[in-house]
């Protein structure tokens, strides 16, 4: 029953949490949305500097919230991959320093494995095997979760990730950053059937289409051309709500079809969803309904565990620590490590 202090700094949230197995003792998240909003996206150098400014206050708050002392903590964890290198280094260096000072084992964690473990934070009874749909600003993947550290990627995006597509379409519609939440809100007042948009299919060299891979660049381009056409016809009245609803519904429909098809083909009877786009209300609606229709259990974590946080990192780290998996203090951060290579982070 390991208790872990975990740090997450892979992108633009500075987060610290203390987790006992699947129970959250404290969780602190300092968002940088306001900092990057002016630029329409995350500026890596600014993100790293902000992590340096914020990390100590987050550590102090997490310890205070937990009512625990260092004698109660069994290990220190940090996200080591993937992510922005400079941002990752802030969390990794901080965690390693704490591990040395307090003589605790260090546990490096894969960010996507953290999103998988967010499922357990809200439902501690959930266990592998299951299919995980990971959808965020940087990733769109269908992952067969076999056990702690052992994953098979069955589907991925070939270009833009789903969350990235939301941000880019929001920019086209002058809705600001981040795009996901504002499109979700606006779509509630629009007609999702107003415009027919392509779901995006990935062609195979031998012909046909990949059943589980995604592509969103064509959808983004279709929205751009539609906006250009509509602006020519009526420069004073762009149907932004209808465009947002049609785009969002298309993304949700595509992800739902691929997830259900993958689960059925592989005989998997449960799907967990993780990542920032898991907060999207239309995706939740469509996938839950499809799950009921096909007798597949579908789990979405609460909204607070969809976006980046350190509690999910701590949950994954605790599981690894319980199994005797620890990381070397010489372990380097890695901006592109695949989810299938998670066990490269550990010595055991």
UniProtKB/Swiss-Prot annotation:
Localisation: Cytoplasm
EC number: 2.3.1.234
Requisite cofactors: Fe(2+)
Binding of Fe cation, residues: 111, 115, 308
Function: Required for the formation of a threonylcarbamoyl group on adenosine at position 37 (t(6)A37) in tRNAs that read codons beginning with adenine. Is involved in the transfer of the threonylcarbamoyl moiety of threonylcarbamoyl-AMP (TC-AMP) to the N6 group of A37, together with TsaE and TsaB. TsaD likely plays a direct catalytic role in this reaction.
Primary enzyme class: transferase
SUPFAM superfamilies reported for this sequence: Actin-like ATPase domain (SSF53067)
Cofactor note: Binds 1 Fe(2+) ion per subunit.
Protein name: tRNA N6-adenosine threonylcarbamoyltransferase
One GO BP: tRNA threonylcarbamoyladenosine modification
Residues that, per the record, bind substrate: 134-138, 167, 180, 184, 280
Main localisation: cytoplasm
A Gene Ontology cellular-component term: cytoplasm
Ranges in a coiled coil: none
Catalytic activity: L-threonylcarbamoyladenylate + adenosine(37) in tRNA = N(6)-L-threonylcarbamoyladenosine(37) in tRNA + AMP + H(+)
């Amino acid at each position: 029953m390991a208790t872990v202090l975990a740090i997450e700094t892979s992108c633009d949230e500075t987060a610290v949490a203390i987790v006992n197995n699947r129970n959250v003792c404290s969780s602190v998240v300092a968002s940088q949305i306001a900092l990057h909003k002016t630029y329409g996206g995350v500026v890596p150098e600014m993100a790293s500097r902000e992590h340096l400014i914020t990390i100590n206050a987050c550590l102090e708050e997490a310890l205070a919230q937990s009512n625990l002392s260092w004698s109660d903590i069994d290990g220190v964890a940090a996200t080591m991959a993937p992510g922005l290198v400079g941002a990752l280094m802030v969390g990794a260096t901080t965690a390693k320093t704490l591990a040395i000072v307090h003589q605790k084992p260090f546990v490096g964690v894969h960010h996507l494995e953290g999103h998988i473990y967010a499922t357990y934070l809200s439902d501690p009874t959930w266990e592998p095997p299951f299919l995980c749909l990971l959808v965020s600003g940087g990733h769109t993947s269908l992952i067969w979760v076999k056990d702690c550290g052992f994953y098979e990627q069955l589907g991925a995006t070939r270009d833009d990730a789903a969350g990235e597509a939301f941000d880019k379409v929001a920019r086209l519609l002058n809705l600001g950053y981040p795009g996901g939440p504002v499109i979700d809100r606006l779509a509630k007042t629009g007609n999702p059937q107003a415009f027919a948009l392509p779901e995006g299919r990935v062609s195979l060299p031998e012909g046909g289409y990949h059943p589980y891979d995604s592509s969103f660049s064509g959808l983004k381009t279709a929205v751009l051309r539609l906006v250009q056409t509509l602006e020519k016809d009526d420069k004073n009245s762009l149907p932004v709500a209808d465009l947002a609803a049609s785009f969002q519904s298309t993304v949700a429909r595509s992800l739902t079809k691929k997830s259900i098809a993958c689960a059925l083909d592989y005989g998997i009877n449960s799907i967990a969803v993780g990542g920032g786009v898991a907060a999207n209300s239309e995706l939740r609606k469509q996938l839950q309904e499809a799950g009921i229709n096909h007798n597949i259990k579908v789990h979405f974590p609460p909204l607070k565990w969809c976006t980046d946080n350190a509690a999910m990192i701590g949950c994954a780290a605790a599981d690894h620590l319980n199994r005797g998996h620890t990381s070397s203090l010489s372990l380097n951060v890695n901006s592109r490590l695949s989810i299938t290579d998670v066990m490269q982070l550990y010595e055991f």
